[in-house]
Amino acid sequence: MDHDSYSDGYLRDILEGVRTIAVVGASPRRERPSHGVMAYLQRHGYRAIPVNPNAAGDRINGETCYGALAEVPEPIDMVDVFRRSAAAGDAVDQAIVVGAKIVWMQLGVRDDAAAARAEAVGLKVVMNRCPAIEIPRLGLPPR
């Protein structure tokens, strides 16, 4: 897959097909982009579950934060990665292990080797994009 360009149809299929999104790197700090994007996803009807080992057990946007994807007690459709590119591979590998269907790496986050590992086992991958930008750009209504 060409990760420099995604068709609107590809992004739309992903965003219309997912329900539960684990936000890896979610922050309890309101000024952090991960906090705002998680809240945006919730307002649009997605179940957004925070994952951050530094905030495990805390509540972020009304949801319990988990220390790792494997601790989330329900199936995860998509993993939204708010980590530096150098740390994204670990989140992708965890997404593979827990059976997520999609890995979405946020703006500025790209790991081609991790993307290849995910795609090799059937996951869809998006890199260097933000769902909170793509949802309104595509005209997707709240769920």
Predicted regions: what they are:
Residues 1-7, 58-74, 80-89:
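Glycine-rich, highly charged phosphate/nucleotide-binding loops
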Residues 17, 74-78, 99:
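Alpha-helix C-terminal capping/helix-to-coil transition sites in glycosyltransferase folds
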Residues 29-32, 39-59:
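NAD(P)-binding Rossmann-fold cofactor-contacting core
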Residues 50-51, 105, 125-128:
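General beta-strand structural signal in soluble alpha/beta enzymes
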Residues 74, 111-135:
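Short acidic, glycine/proline-enriched helix-loop-strand junctions
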Residues 95-118:
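ADP-ribose/adenylate-binding Rossmann-like module
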Residues 134-143:
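A charged, well-structured terminal subsegment
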